[in-house]
Regions:
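Ligand-binding pockets and gating/stacking loops
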Residues: 1-288
Length: 288
């Protein structure tokens, strides 16, 4: 049975339009130099142009923070280091729709870490440049750039995608969850009204874990492509990107999630690309 999936790959700091967009409109276009590697998928592609998301009048500056935030929300963020106000992103709208059918509602991937904080773009909080996924107007979803951490989120701390290892992990998690459920049931009778309300919030998260475990048990015999647990973050950029795409594909094939966003870099990226003869940092060189 076919299912709907959604994936986004974000390229920061803009693109060279003359090398990105095809020269003509319609179905007979030739792929541009930047899109040429996608030639094997030419018959399944649609290249869109003419889209824009212009800042409201009186809201100058902060173009990098605005670019990442508006990409999937179409909301211009406020100029503030602490006050977060964006909007639910497109991926999270779909995650709400698809999430009940998978163990993970969504997956947020990146190549760079999101450890920057404070103001990154003329008074705008760094978080606006660090992620494109927003669960709500004030709840940004952090990205994960460590392939090992992504693998463990998908399959637990097993060493591979081997079915027996996955089932053993599920059984261990089920045992822990049963113990937690018994303890909270005993605790509930000793609490006052206020504390019971807090416990209720905690139990909501426990029920979500139960739901994911139930799905994991139902899918434990599913044929999952073999993959060893990654050791960590590859030193080589290309190897890092390839591994993240492999994990993205594995998550889809395993139906562990149907919604994934992937940032190839963050806004204001300082990454360099010596492997292609570009030793300068990404962000400064984008101001060509």
């Amino acid at each position: 049975k076919s299912v709907h999936r959604f994936g986004v790959v974000y390229v920061p700091n803009g693109v060279i339009h003359s090398a990105w967009l095809p020269g003509v409109e319609g179905t007979s276009y030739e792929l541009s130099p930047t899109l040429a590697p996608l030639a094997p998928f030419r018959d399944r592609m649609v290249v869109l142009s003419g889209l824009s998301c212009v800042s409201p009048p009186g809201r100058p500056g902060g173009f990098h923070a605005k670019a990442a935030t508006r990409f999937l929300t179409d909301v211009t963020p406020p100029t503030s280091e602490t006050w977060l106000d964006a909007g639910i992103s497109m991926d999270q709208v779909l995650a709400t729709e698809f999430g009940s059918k998978t163990q993970l509602a969504s997956l947020e991937l990146a190549v760079e870490s999101n450890e920057t904080a404070g103001a990154c773009d003329i008074g705008f909080a760094c978080v606006y440049s660090n992620t494109i996924a927003w669960k709500s107007a004030n709840t940004p979803l952090p990205t994960q750039n460590n392939p090992r951490a992504v693998f463990e989120r998908l399959f637990g701390d097993s060493r591979s995608t081997d079915a027996r290892a996955r089932l053993a992990r599920i059984e261990q998690d089920r045992s822990i969850l049963d113990s937690v459920t018994e303890e909270t049931a005993r605790l509930r009778g000793t609490l006052g009204a206020s504390d019971r309300a807090k416990l209720g919030e905690y139990l909501e998260s426990v029920r979500d874990v139960e739901r994911r475990l139930r799905l994991a048990e139902e899918q434990s015999d599913r044929d999952v492509p073999w993959m060893d647990r990654p050791a960590g973050i590859p030193a080589d950029y290309d190897a890092h990107v390839d591994l993240m795409f492999d994990l993205m594909l594995l998550a889809y094939q395993s139906d562990l999630t149907r919604v994934i966003t992937f940032m190839l870099g963050r806004e204001f990226s300082g990454m360099t690309y010596p492997q292609i003869g570009v030793p300068d940092a990404h962000h400064p060189i984008s101001h060509h």
